[in-house]
Amino acid sequence: MQMIIGDLRKDPHALETAWVSVIAFAGVARTIVPLHEIASFYPPRLPVGGGTSLGAALRELTVQIDTQVRKTTHEAKGDWKPVVYLLTDGRPTDDTTAEVKRWKDHYASKVNLIAVGLGPSADLNTLRQLTENVMLFTESQEGDFTRFIKWITASVTAHSRSVGDDKQPELSQTEYIVRLAKDEPVKAYDENCVTLTGRCSKTRRPYLMKYERPPARISGLDFSLNLNSFNIAGCYPIDEDYFAWSDATATGLQVNTSELHGVPGCPHCGNASAFALCSCGKLLCIDGPDDVICPWCETGLSFSNDGGNTNFDVNRGRG
């Protein structure tokens, strides 16, 4: 976002006509920057949370349009037609039916919405219900994301130069980086990753574990085969805001540890395993056989190597 705003400030048309607002959505949706002129806009820190509440995001967007975008009256000219860039990398985890219908009935004709799916797990079918301008970004080599940011900047600049025109500028495509997503297959859910949250047993600070499903190629066959397993991609420290931005509704989704390959260490204290389960159903870190206090529920726990079957079910996040 810093790069986008920096480039827009160099363009006199954008500097004079464009105002920017930022709505973030994970398990919840909130406006983190209300409509603001570019000259004094300060790029915010984007939050991280569990879930993709697209319905809530649409509801928040319409509230901001109704309250922040000035309408033309007999006394004064209102704002130009808003341009909205909707970026999402997953499928909605809330019910979007009512909000999609309300958008199509009352807002679609008044807003130029450009929806961009980020990666193969984006629910393009839902995005197509909102707008004809559905694009897909797939990062395939180093530097693609930087070029994608440049594409957004160029698109905003083009719209700022066309204010007052009846016809909006056509969306340019940058080779394989951003392309129209008309014929992409619909994915009902993200089956390519598993996210789990835990807490450090020493510092009580939270962390996020991510497992990804690897594509397997069979020699001589021109297709990839997804196996029923996930490899560890990383374990990352997060802050308490993660839970404030996550959907607290229980999903009932679980995964068995037999499907998860690799045990990460704790990113906070360095304990050997960030994957120990308390009877409360939450994960914590341990450093081998030990007596610890669960940082979630304060229960005293004793872990040992008993040589038995250690596979168990664990609650997975929304992604």
Predicted regions mapped to residue ranges:
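Cys/His-rich microdomains that often coordinate metals
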Residues: 204-211, 272-274, 282-284, 300-303
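Short metal-binding segments enriched for Cys and/or His
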Residues: 226-251, 299-315
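C-terminal helix of von Willebrand factor
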Residues: 124-188
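Von Willebrand factor
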Residues: 1-33, 40-81, 83-87, 94-95, 115-125, ...
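Short cysteine-rich clusters marking metal-coordination/redox-active sites
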Residues: 200-203, 266-269, 277-280, 294-297
